[in-house]
Amino acid sequence: MLFYSIVLLMPFIFRVFFSSIKDEKNKKIYLTCIFMCLFIISSLRGESVGIDTASYRETYCLIRDYGIGAYYRDGESYEYGYLILIWILSRIFHDPQILFVVFSVVTNYAMCKTIYKYSNDPMMASFLYIMWGFASSMNTSRQQFAFAIILLGIPFLEKKNFLKWVLLVLGATTVHKSTLVFLPIAVIPLLRKKSDEFETMIIVLIGFFGSILLLDHFINLVIYLVPRYYKHFYGQRYGGGTGEASLFWIMLYFLILFMAIRLFYIDIRIRAKASSFIVEERDSTPVVFFMLLTALQCVQPFFVAYVSSLFTRIGVFSRVGLYIMIPYVIKKSCDKYFTNDSRRIIYIVFYLLFGIFAFHIYQQDGYGIIPYSFFWN
């Protein structure tokens, strides 16, 4: 755990070397240092780091030695895009470690760029990602890679380029079909340039309650697209008493969501710049995207507890909304309602509580990443 404790402290360690990270240049260097370290850790990990890492290596070796056809004869059925990616890499590189290098560089670059472009507190956002997302990225690497493609496509939403967004999502689904859930988000660019608070609230609520009402249809679609997931929905369920659906976390996510909506549109009304939260102050497309992810996080614990443990995979997507929204809500609330001394206390309490929580998450080792080892060991 000492190794991962240092990883959790990286946002604070690198912060010591900068007098300020509000400056765009310092912010870029700061985030580059953090995510370069995360890239190295993720890409050089050994076969025992991550529950699915060994299976990724086996798939690579099978396709490298016998071609894609041999993989299907072996009775498996991964997405074509993923298999083609492996085939191309295996024609150039013999060692399967290159697959993790590619996964890591794309995943960490996408997250680094997202935090740089849309977060008003890069230190807190980086810490939240390391706490909630980094360990997962060394296990669900294929899904993280597909979602990274989605994150890199956010500019298409900003520019209201409907066709490019649809093509991007369809491309990502050839790596992991779960990214198909982002196809309906293509309607966001159809919003007015100056959307208001009520409109955004309606969109987020429709997305939230629509996901509940259409749950059965969604499950049937998933089973149709990926038959091997049948057992997850009809053969494996959590009980309603699990901590995954605790009222505390659901209420906390809801509070973050609605505070973010409220504070963002207060900024709009007073014509105050929302730091680097969005590229253009009055373009609501990126903020609605992250609000929808946060809304998805609100409903995710319910799905995990009462439908299927498979919905834990939704967290790969939805928690990115929290990386952006939590720092935004805390910073804006502190600036608006608290004195300087009170702000310091709030930040200290936040980092202490979430630091303990982060240590607990890693200690539980739900992704099989402890102990860490390099691939040459």
Model features per residue range: what roles?
Residues 54-57, 64, 69, 83, ...:
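Alpha-helical transmembrane segments and terminal signal-anchor/GPI-anchor hydrophobic tails
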Residues 293, 343-377:
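Transmembrane helical bundles and short interhelical boundary loops of multi-pass, membrane-embedded
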Residues 86-90, 99-110, 149, 322:
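Transmembrane alpha-helices of multi-pass, membrane-embedded glycan-processing enzymes
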Residues 133, 164-187:
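Membrane-interface alpha helices of multi-pass inner-membrane proteins
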Residues 54-62, 71-94:
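Short hydrophobic/aromatic helix or loop-helix immediately within or flanking a transmembrane segment
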Residues 25, 112-131:
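Transmembrane-helix signature of polytopic, membrane-embedded enzymes
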